Amino acid sequence: MNLVRTAMLLAFMTALFMFVGFLIGGRAGMMIAFVIAAGMNFFSYWNSDRMVLSAYRAQQVDERNAPEFFRIVRDLARNAGLPMPKVYLYDSPQPNAFATGRNPENAAVAASTGLLSALSAEEVAGVMAHELAHIQNRDTLTMTITATLAGAISMLGNFAFFFGGNRENNSNPLGFVGVIVAMIVAPLAAMLVQMAISRTREYSADRRGAEICGNPLWLASALGKIARGAAHVPNEDAERNPATAHMFIINPLSGERMDNLFSTHPNTENRIAALHDMAQSGMNVSTSPARAANPSRKSRSVPDTGLGRGGSQPPKGPWS
């Protein structure tokens, strides 16, 4: 079913891309847009995960430089019956995380240094279980391709003003009005698609993530902390790449952006309430992150992934 939804998404995004091309350059513009969209669809399938990880300058970590974090992901993946995903950290003070990849065999999970600083090991386990649930539900392909194409469509809508605003250009059937329509409609339509695919999937990933980690309250507690952190700590890379916002466990964009007029995520309080209801329904809860993980608290630093921005060291945290 996810394959059908992904195909429908690609078809819609391609049609939207062609529509903007038509408004800019008539039939010729529409055909050029079709060729570009077809190439982007092919490229996105194979490379969109790398593009997203690169946009956040995420660095891959392993058991040598992030032993406890890596072990938590490994044990959770075992609980879920998933292949071990690649594990990444990206330098950002905002606590957040996302998953990407075209299938479970080629998946990756990424967490911010701020997440490891702000959350306990149990809460981190809840977050990573949520991301593994997205991988298991095969949401990551759709979410990653949407991020790539939505960003391209928004950019095309902005470029429409510069490349399609020539009143003497007879190839544009709607003239300057059509260009204005493209500037407004294209980014809005892309944002609505992001909302549609993200909101319904977050609840499903929350539920499955709670089952994977064994305790819904870990994820509930983590969501509260991440939401408060995201509200006060900006994510500069996300602000520059708002099309990726729906990939994160909590919307990383600040409230100052118009992008937040239509949220890509369901209300955090409702998600937390659903997890509390799940815990109260009698679900067997675990007391340690994942089945085989029992993180020690001897380490007091975030795993070393190199210098942070401006040559500074990443912020210190309660565990690694």
Curated annotation (Swiss-Prot):
<keyword id="KW-0997">Cell inner membrane</keyword>
<comment type="similarity">
    <text>Belongs to the peptidase M48B family.</text>
</comment>
<feature type="transmembrane region" description="Helical">
    <location>
        <begin position="28"/>
        <end position="48"/>
    </location>
</feature>
<dbReference type="InterPro" id="IPR022919">
    <property type="entry name" value="Pept_M48_protease_HtpX"/>
</dbReference>
<dbReference type="InterPro" id="IPR001915">
    <property type="entry name" value="Peptidase_M48"/>
</dbReference>
<keyword id="KW-0472">Membrane</keyword>
<dbReference type="InterPro" id="IPR050083">
    <property type="entry name" value="HtpX_protease"/>
</dbReference>
<feature type="binding site">
    <location>
        <position position="134"/>
    </location>
    <ligand>
        <name>Zn(2+)</name>
    </ligand>
</feature>
<keyword id="KW-0645">Protease</keyword>
<keyword id="KW-1003">Cell membrane</keyword>
<feature type="binding site">
    <location>
        <position position="130"/>
    </location>
    <ligand>
        <name>Zn(2+)</name>
    </ligand>
</feature>
<dbReference type="GO" id="GO:0005886">
    <property type="term" value="C:plasma membrane"/>
</dbReference>
<keyword id="KW-0862">Zinc</keyword>
<keyword id="KW-0378">Hydrolase</keyword>
<dbReference type="GO" id="GO:0008270">
    <property type="term" value="F:zinc ion binding"/>
</dbReference>
<keyword id="KW-0812">Transmembrane</keyword>
<feature type="transmembrane region" description="Helical">
    <location>
        <begin position="145"/>
        <end position="165"/>
    </location>
</feature>
<keyword id="KW-0482">Metalloprotease</keyword>
<feature type="active site">
    <location>
        <position position="131"/>
    </location>
</feature>
<dbReference type="Pfam" id="PF01435">
    <property type="entry name" value="Peptidase_M48"/>
</dbReference>
<feature type="transmembrane region" description="Helical">
    <location>
        <begin position="6"/>
        <end position="26"/>
    </location>
</feature>
<dbReference type="GO" id="GO:0006508">
    <property type="term" value="P:proteolysis"/>
</dbReference>
<feature type="region of interest" description="Disordered">
    <location>
        <begin position="283"/>
        <end position="320"/>
    </location>
</feature>
<feature type="transmembrane region" description="Helical">
    <location>
        <begin position="173"/>
        <end position="193"/>
    </location>
</feature>
<keyword id="KW-1133">Transmembrane helix</keyword>
<keyword id="KW-0479">Metal-binding</keyword>
<dbReference type="GO" id="GO:0004222">
    <property type="term" value="F:metalloendopeptidase activity"/>
</dbReference>
<feature type="binding site">
    <location>
        <position position="202"/>
    </location>
    <ligand>
        <name>Zn(2+)</name>
    </ligand>
</feature>
<protein>
    <recommendedName>
        <fullName>Protease HtpX homolog</fullName>
        <ecNumber>3.4.24.-</ecNumber>
    </recommendedName>
</protein>
